[in-house]
Structures are given as structure tokens and as C-alpha cells.
Amino acid sequence: MTSGEALGTRSVEDGGTISRQQWRWSVLAGMASYLDAGSIVALGAGLALFQSYLGLSDGAVGALAAIGPNAIGCAIGAFIGGRLGDKLGRKRIYKYDLLVYALGILCIALAVNTPMLFIGTFVVGVAVGADVPTSLALVGEFSPAKARGKLVGFTQVAWNLGPVIVLLLSLALTPLDLLGARIVFLHLFVVALVTWAMRRGLSESARWTSASATKDVKYQLKALFSGAHLKALLFTAIVYVFWNIAAGTGGIFTPYVIKTLNAGSQAAGVALSCAGFVIGIGVTTLVFMKFADRSHHTRKWMWGIGAVLQVVAYGVYVVLPFSIPVIIANIVLFGVGCSLAGEAFYKVWSQELFPTMLRGTAQGFTFGVARTLLGVWSFFLPTLAAGGFTLAGGLLTLFLVISGATGFFFMPDTSGKSLEQIEAERATA
């Protein structure tokens, strides 16, 4: 057994102490989130430019958003990658998928016609979809019991950092129009190749290595759809599916909608989106990573406050006209709220509530369902928002109420417990 594998095994006993090696692994695994969100926002920032260059209709724009990293392409990758990560190991998936991602990104960057743009977008979606559940399972499995929220939360910092870098580049390169968008995609191409090279030295998950040696019936796929596992699957799915529609709308469509509805320029849309992700980095780092492992009671407070802020964030679109001041209010409120009651907790619960041999499958399933439904939503949103954002804002507010209420009232008591302890408690519940 290598030192890395031994470290992964001992993490249960280490309490809240995080080693330098664990931080390094978290950074490399977290780059999946960086590349995921970065590709989503790069596509969003360049959407109007590609539409003008290629003469795309509103329907084509919706279809492009629907098949890519924000939606259906990612969903297909998550369904396949999550399951294969459980069957074949985490390392076999993250060892190759970033090469596929890089190929897709390069296709987008060099796109001179509609087929190139659509093929590249779909390939990127599939590749990043396969990487995310596998990488997150790896982080959850090597994290100390009392620092799991901190390390998984760090991947959310990476998820916010990707868009910030992408949006700042987009803002700086705005005078170059479409050439600037191409350069942004080339940046993601380089980051993917560097991350792939650095990941080659990562060890396999010690927990997966141990669990894969058994043939226990409780690890079979059908076990995921019964008993405690089914309850956990429904819980994480409801929380994430409804939240993700709102988050995905802001991530990919904010610059597009601002420009299309003449609420501001392309540069203004990019800058406002960037501000939201900067807020996310700050709140996740200073609040989520600090308090997520403290206690179940603390998690409830964090979630409750965050959920309310997010509902208000999209509720303003229902009662106020779509304008720059209203957009700023939405971005600030949602930026704070989603850092406390959003994807970070979904990621943590997805590691805590499922056994090792079903962990990637479960997260791939819920991640995939969420991205599929976001794809359906994305297809109709340009048409839905063409005459204003009131109806879309009302629906998004409703979705956030459902997600927030589910997370608050059905939140599991898992803070600070080892994965083995949680599994044992759920088996006897």
C-alpha cells in the first residue's frame, strides 16, 4: 500500500487535521469544478457573439446551451462516469477524461461553423460530467471526518474561481469580440492539459480499493433505489435539481439576457456575473469552509439563512422591472445565499449519504438529472425571457422555495461523522 493510500485510510481517525497531501489532492480534484463552471460561463459570455457570427436563431442558442456542460451533455457524462467510477475506480476515469475535455474545448475555440460549435460543446459537457462525480467522490473518501465539509467546500471555491477567471478574461478581451471569446476557450484548453498532467501522480482512493474487494449485495445498483439509499437519492435530487435551474440560469444566461433585453452592454453583463462569483468565493471561504463541519445545528442555520436570501434574490424579478440595479440586487443576494445553501452542501451530502461503491453512481445520477432538466429549461428560456424576465423570475423563485424547504426540513445529521459511522447509522435507521 502506498503512503497516499494509507493516508486516505487513516483520514477517519485524523479528526479535523488536513495534511498537505490532502490539500494537494483537493486542488487537483477541485479543478474538475473549475473547468466545469469555467466552460459553462465561457459559453455564456460568448453566446451572443457566436449567435451573431453564425447567424443562430433563439432556438439554436437554446439548443446549444441545452447540449453542453450546463445541461444534457454533462448529464450523459455524469450518468456514465459516476457509474464507471464505482465499477472501475476513481483513477481510471479522471486519468483520461480531461483529454477528451481539452479536445472539445479546442473544437469550440476554433469553430468556424455551427457543427463545430455544437460538437465541441457536447463533447465538453460529456467529459466534465464524467469527471465531477468521480473527483468529488475521491475528495469525500480521503477527507478527515471533521474536515470533509471544508475540503469539499474548497471544490466549490474552485467552481467559483473558474468563472471569475473566465469572466475577467472576457471583460479584458471584449474589444476583440469573437476573437476574445476564442482566447478564453484556449485558456481552458491549457488548464485542462496542465491539470491532466499533474493528476497522473494521484493514488487510487483507499476506501474504493477496500470496498471493491467485496461483493456485498448492498453495493449492487438496485440497492440505490430502495430503503435509506432511495430516501437519500430523493433528498439530494430535489435539493439540487431545483437549485441548479436557478444557478444555471444565472451562470450561462445573465450576460446574454442583459444584452438581449437592452438592460446593459455585453461588458456590463460579464462584469455583473463576475461579481456574483467573487462573492461566492468570499462567502464559501470565510463562512462555509469554516463552519460546515462544526455541528448539525450550525448547518441548519447556514442553510436556512442562505435559502431565504436566494428566494428573495429571484423574487425581486417578480415585483421590480428588469434593470441593472435589480440585477445587482439579485447577484449579491444569490451570491451570498447559494454559498450557504447550494451546491456545496449538495456535494457534501452526496459523499456522506451513500456507501463507497454507490457514491459516484448516486451523485452521477442526481447530477445528471439536474443537468438534463436544466437543459430542457435552457432550451425554452431565450424564448421565455424574450419579452421580459417576470415569468422566468417567478418560476425560479418557486424552484428555490422547494429546494430550500427540502434541505432545511429533511437535512441529515452527518456533520463530523466518519463515512463508516454514517453508513452504519443509516443501515439501522
Residue ranges, per PLM feature:
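Helix-breaking motifs and short loop linkers at transmembrane-helix boundaries and internal kinks
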Residues: 89, 110-116, 144, 296, ...
